[in-house]
Regions:
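Amphipathic alpha-helical interaction segments
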Residues: 3, 24, 58, 76, ...
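Short helix-capping/turn signature of helix-turn-helix
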Residues: 19, 79-84, 131
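Helix-turn-helix
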Residues: 1-24, 28
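Hydrophobic/aromatic-rich alpha-helical bundle segments in the mid-to-C-terminal region
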Residues: 110-158, 166-171
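Amphipathic alpha-helical packing segments from all-alpha helical-bundle domains
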Residues: 64-78, 85-112, 122-126, 160-164
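Hydrophobic/aromatic residues within well-ordered alpha-helical segments
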Residues: 22, 29, 33, 59, ...
């Protein structure tokens, strides 16, 4: 906290007036970045999609414009969350929000009869969350150089194909 206070030109005490600890600071930081980068507009597009397939497509689309704006912060949290409880709390907060979004889409998919009954809702939500994760976007768009529009189509098709297909149960 001392280094951060020095970097922004305030006293450590002034920083603690606003944030009682690093965890609260990290949570405020990720919330601020999401607000500044208009994450709610992307979430609204997902929520208001005509059907579950449209919601998956809207979520993938949101990744193509939101992730470049948060890439530095997402990578920093990813590098530090295992060892830093404050970064871990900020990451857990974001992941919980993502999982709520995935669960909502899976509920729609199931209500529309497009989720194969061999999937549990929890398994399906985890898969959808992973397919639309920052890591998958980063690997496909940045490392593999897949154009963003193609990424949207690949993620949408992969999610719909996987979740509409039966899963064998291992006994």
């Amino acid at each position: 906290m001392s280094a951060l206070a020095r970097a922004v030109g305030i006293s450590r005490q002034a920083l603690y007036l606003h944030f009682p600890d690093r965890t609260q600071l990290m949570l405020a930081l990720v919330a601020h970045v999401d607000e500044k980068e208009q994450l709610q507009a992307g979430i609204a597009a997902v929520t208001h999609a005509a059907d579950a397939a449209g919601a998956i497509r809207a979520w993938a689309h949101m990744q193509t414009w939101h992730n470049p704006k948060i890439a530095a912060l997402a990578r920093a949290l990813d590098e530090t969350w295992h060892a830093d409880p404050s970064a871990s709390a900020a990451r857990a907060d974001r992941m919980a929000d993502r999982m709520r979004g995935a669960v909502s889409i899976i509920e729609r998919l199931r209500a529309e009869g497009r989720l194969d009954p061999t999937w549990t809702p929890a398994e399906a939500a985890v898969l959808l969350g992973e397919l639309t994760s920052f890591h998958v976007w980063d690997d496909l768009v940045n490392d593999a150089q897949i154009p963003p529009d193609r990424y949207i189509e690949i993620i949408t098709a992969a999610a719909l194909s996987a979740l509409g297909a039966p899963v064998s149960r291992v006994t």
